[in-house]
């Protein structure tokens, strides 16, 4: 089986590789960094390293160099973000970041069925809404009723994106722009299809049809997670296991439940609490480049092959951590773009989530 670990930041023929993107700030755990051009490893004497925040040149004499590899260790938590330049080429637009934390980086969960590639699949639903959107309750109610029904109870994960009219709970990136949202409410399924509001009954029918369409195709990959949470730091080692050969990316969104705000309602009736907002996107960690949030590169995998990505996220002090959870999703290259092929939703706490097989 093919196994990809560490991190690669590649722009055309320039490549920076790091053995890991998260280390324990114990002075021993290390990230080993190499620079390549046209697939040839470069001498570090020929490469300039720049601080990604200040764009100042870094003095490599302050780092450990072993066998033409920069070995990065640290005794204080923080981030080391840099880009490199070689002749007229550089990686400034896509810097590399090494995060140091005050606890051990989690291991990948053990695979309970190494020979199995048949995974439980869930649809990723992104619901675009806002407190000032009077017709949003017609979609919110429909979504709630579909997802709590016996038939659809465990077939999807939901992220609420509050991007309407300068909403106080808008996420930290413009997902509405990335997904081409021009009307509210709007619901996107797996970064592919979308629906607008046509009234409660039609919304229920359309949500079901799109979930059914998504799940009519088997999952292209499974997801396992080893997660550690200490204070306001979250580190997750996410493993992607391919069910079929393909190119994959992986992303993570932090959500929060129990947020309050008066919801404008243009007439949706029923026993719903429209003023309590759940599954609200707080942080997006899936930016590939520009306005593309399809996930971090895992790469090409053969069926049964695995790839990893390490996520490091800071939980804002204003969030109620016990009300937070994380969606991890995998996208797969289809036609000319990436579409979600599986997703899971897990609480924010130290935990081990193995692959879920059918």
Summary of predicted features, one role per range:
Residues 1-6, 11:
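Single conserved hydrophobic/aromatic residue that forms the stacking wall/gate
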Residues 87-93, 334-335:
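Short, solvent-exposed loop/turn segments at the edges of extracellular beta-sandwich modules
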Residues 81-85, 327-329:
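Extracellular recognition modules
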Residues 154-358:
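Short, conserved sequence motifs used for protein processing/export or organelle targeting and
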Residues 12-15, 19-29, 227-231:
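Short, solvent-exposed loop/linker segments at the N-terminal edge
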Residues 114-154:
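Local sequence-structure signature of Cys/Sec-based thiol-disulfide redox active-site neighborhoods
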Residues 26, 74-82, 246:
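Short tyrosine-centred short linear motifs in exposed loops/low-complexity segments
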């Amino acid at each position: 089986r093919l196994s990809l670990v560490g991190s690669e930041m590649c722009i055309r023929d320039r490549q920076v590789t790091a053995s890991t993107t998260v280390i324990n700030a114990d002075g021993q755990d290390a990230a080993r960094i190499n620079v390549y051009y046209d697939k040839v490893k470069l001498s570090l004497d020929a490469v300039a390293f720049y601080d990604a925040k200040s764009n100042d040149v870094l003095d490599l004499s302050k780092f450990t160099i072993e066998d033409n590899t920069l070995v990065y260790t640290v005794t204080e938590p923080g981030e080391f973000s840099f880009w490199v330049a070689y002749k007229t080429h550089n990686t400034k637009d896509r810097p590399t970041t090494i995060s140091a934390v005050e606890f051990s980086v989690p291991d990948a969960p053990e695979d309970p069925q190494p020979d199995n590639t048949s995974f439980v699949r869930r649809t990723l639903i992104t619901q675009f809404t806002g407190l000032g959107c009077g017709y949003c309750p017609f979609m919110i109610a429909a979504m709630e009723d579909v997802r709590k029904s016996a038939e659809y109870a465990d077939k999807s994960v939901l992220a609420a994106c509050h991007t309407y009219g300068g909403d106080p709970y808008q996420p930290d990136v413009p997902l509405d722009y990335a997904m081409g949202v021009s009307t509210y409410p709007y619901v996107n399924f797996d970064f592919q299809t979308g629906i607008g509001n046509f009234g409660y009954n039609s919304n229920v029918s359309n949500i079901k049809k799109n979930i059914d369409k998504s799940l009519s195709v088997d999952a292209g990959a499974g997801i396992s997670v080893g997660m550690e949470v200490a204070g306001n730091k979250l580190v997750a080692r996410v493993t992607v296991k391919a069910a079929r050969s393909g190119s994959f990316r992986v992303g993570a969104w932090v959500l929060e439940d129990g947020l309050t705000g008066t919801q404008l309602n243009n007439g949706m009736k029923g026993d719903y609490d429209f003023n309590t907002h759940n599954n609200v996107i707080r942080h997006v960690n899936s930016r590939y480049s520009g306005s593309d949030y399809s996930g971090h590169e895992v790469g090409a995998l053969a069926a049964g092959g695995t790839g990893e990505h390490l996520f490091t996220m800071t939980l804002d002090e204003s969030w109620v951590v016990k009300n937070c959870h994380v969606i991890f999703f995998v996208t797969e290259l289809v036609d000319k773009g990436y579409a979600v092929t599986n997703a899971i939703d897990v609480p924010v706490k130290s935990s081990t989530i193995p692959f879920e097989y059918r």
